[in-house]
């Protein structure tokens, strides 16, 4: 019987040393599910609300004891005795209990921890790996990783305005080989930076954060690392950017302070199109401010046929906003962050809506992570085809990559690696 008999919430620390929420869910049969939630640095204004205590005497106000208390009292009372295998009903119970549009009463961090822990307990009870529990017998596609090897913007203390410079190994026949490719490029880049006397310290997501003079210098250095690692850019490996443009949009202009530029939406769209012409860039995330829908439309009209344009702050894993974007022809892909929306059921609904509209879905970590690897199972369980979970260092990032290695091994001969076909909506 998969009835829930005990729920325990607790405060633990994330990869940045900030508190986050962990939850254990115990079932009548004795099996347990445990989940910990991540936390973002650059956040969309319409994300579900992460409940923090605001008590400056503890953890600089970032404690999560209120969220934990909600798990141990109200949430526990509401779902005790429910069947853990009824995920949609359970998540709806949490949503109704919270009663707000943005989960600000109970906290999306409290709700998500419970939602994930319940799913893990139910999978354990069913004797299934989590990815199989999520996706059934059709779950067999490994994701192409977006590997964030250079950090800028809000993730680093340097002069790069673009937040993430990523490599995507697409010319390999398996996830295992793709991971090796990414790791070899990471180490080649480290040597290049060290030889130039540049910093090889890593940022929140495990990428390097050196002081490049410009975005183009950074991209050219990454191309050199790809070549030195023995791979061909444009064939074996493609590039991806996360502009996080909301972070440098002020008074209607895009301020690239590192390059001394102030650009209109149209000029910034041209700037990105120029980069995409010069470099093998296949994906650009948050290329415009989350509220600059006219800019997004211009960017989509200009690049949407040949570059994956991913909405993160734009869509915040929210089906209402995604639906509007689809209707208006804005972007062609959605970034999926489980803590932006706060339950697994709503997360899966966003992935499904994107796929039906011919948009791609990229499953993503946050900059503040834990050892929890649920997103790896979500990526395979939904056959998403892409995952974004950091660079090739820091064990909070490796936890997801290593889980994907285990899943690929478990799948055996039926595992498929999509490579370039992950971008099924590009020409």
Curated annotation (Swiss-Prot):
The catalytic residues are 205 (proton donor), 337 (proton acceptor)
Instruction: Tell me a Gene Ontology molecular-function term this record carries.
Output: phosphopyruvate hydratase activity
The record's comment on protein family reads: Belongs to the enolase family.
Organism this protein belongs to: Ralstonia pickettii (strain 12J)
Main location class: cytoplasm
Under which main EC class is this enzyme filed? lyase
Kindly list the places in or outside the cell where this protein is found, as annotated in its UniProt entry.
Cytoplasm; Secreted; Cell surface
Please give the function described in this protein's UniProt entry.
Catalyzes the reversible conversion of 2-phosphoglycerate (2-PG) into phosphoenolpyruvate (PEP). It is essential for the degradation of carbohydrates via glycolysis.
Which InterPro entries does this one have? Enolase (IPR000941), Enolase-like_C_sf (IPR036849), Enolase-like_N (IPR029017), Enolase_C (IPR020810), Enolase_CS (IPR020809), Enolase_N (IPR020811)
* Protein name per the record: Enolase
Taken from the UniProt entry, a GO cellular component term is: phosphopyruvate hydratase complex
Which residues does the record give as Mg(2+) binding sites? 242, 285, 312
